[in-house]
Design a protein with these regions (language model features):
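Short, intrinsically disordered, low-complexity segments enriched in Ser/Thr and Pro
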Residues: 27-28, 32, 38, 260-267
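Active-site core of glycosidic bond-cleaving carbohydrate-active enzymes
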Residues: 1-2, 6-17, 24-35, 46-201
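Non-catalytic C-terminal accessory modules of carbohydrate-active enzymes
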Residues: 145-306
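Short coil/turn linker and secondary-structure boundary residues
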Residues: 21, 94, 221-224
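Structured alpha-helical bundle/scaffold domains in large eukaryotic membrane-trafficking regulators
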Residues: 45, 49, 207-210
């Protein structure tokens, strides 16, 4: 149902622009299904002894939940669809109990910097490319440090040829098992998707820039760039590169498309390095470490300086 909700929401939002008569009933169906889901979810929430409540992906009546404790799916098993519905599906608000519970469960399940025991292998194993699903949910929720460490952990589980096995044992596993495809191309696609969202993240009608860039990413002084990446606001090209001294500069270009309601960017890129100028657009530095830039501006350049 979570995938269905995410898909219906996407169709509903698209039809608000397209106004296709055949799809006019999608909005009411989505609302009806979401209400039914929320009612069922409130009854299925589980209180975890670690101090949070979460929504399991298997209902209490599922035969798998009646197995011996060793063979029973873990609380974090199959939470991938919940990650997808949180982001990019954006079915829930950031303070929804489903979101809060999912994040707490994934954090509590983290081993070797990524969520563990989330797939077919229930004991001392990781489903590698589940990690970027969760990292993107963290990033959308504003948990930048968790997103960064989880994505870094995911990269550290790649093979020497920069590919990922679907599931593999933890380093401490007493009995190692491997499961699934090798390499798994979905894993490679998720790597690209997260890297894109580090620079350009669509949050509803808001555009969040550099959300996933943290100081360690800038230590080598290497530039970052996206060229014509598709967004709901038109194709965007965006680059970040070193400038004179310790400064960094960015260049933003947005082509045809409706402008977002807001464009946000980090005020402080590095300790002691602050957004000083935006040429080509008005900007306002907020007290929360976020600067807003005129969303109607299609091209601008910015610079962070001491």
């Amino acid at each position: 149902m979570l995938w269905a909700l995410a898909g219906l929401r996407a169709v509903m939002l698209a039809n608000q622009k397209l106004q296709l008569a055949d799809l006019s009933r999608v909005e009411s169906f989505y609302g009806e299904l979401l209400r039914a889901f929320n009612h069922a979810a409130s009854q299925e929430m589980v209180a975890d002894p670690r101090g949070f409540s979460y929504l399991p992906m298997l209902m209490r009546e599922d035969p798998a939940m009646q197995r011996d404790t060793w063979d029973r799916p873990r609380p974090q098993t199959s939470q991938w669809a919940c990650s997808h519905s949180i982001f990019p599906g954006q079915v829930f608000s950031k303070d929804d109990p489903v979101v809060r519970g999912h994040i707490a469960l994934m954090q509590a399940s983290t081993q070797e910097d990524i969520p563990a025991e989330t797939g077919w292998l229930h004991h001392e194993a990781v489903w590698n490319y589940n990690a970027p699903f969760v990292a993107e949910a963290y990033l959308w929720a504003g948990l930048r440090d968790w997103a960064h460490s989880t994505f870094r952990g995911y990269l550290n589980h790649a093979s020497p040829l920069y590919a990922w096995r679907e599931e593999q044992p933890l380093q401490k596993a007493l009995l190692g098992m491997a499961w699934g495809d090798m390499p798994h191309n979905w894993a490679s696609a998720e790597c690209i998707r997260y890297l894109r969202h580090m620079l350009v993240l669509e949050d509803g009608q808001k555009l969040r820039l550099l959300e996933g860039i943290l100081p360690p990413d800038l230590r080598t002084g290497q530039p970052f760039a996206l060229i014509d990446t598709p967004t709901r606001f038109g194709r965007i090209s965006f680059s970040l590169e070193p400038a004179a001294g310790r400064a960094w500069k960015a260049h933003f270009v947005r082509k045809e498309g409706d402008h977002p309601e807001a464009v946000e960017i980090r005020t402080n890129l590095l300790p002691g390095l602050t957004l000083r100028r935006v040429n080509g657009a008005g900007f306002h530095a907020g007290a929360d470490g976020i600067s807003t830039i005129d969303p109607a501006a299609r091209e601008w350049r910015s610079i962070w300086e001491p």
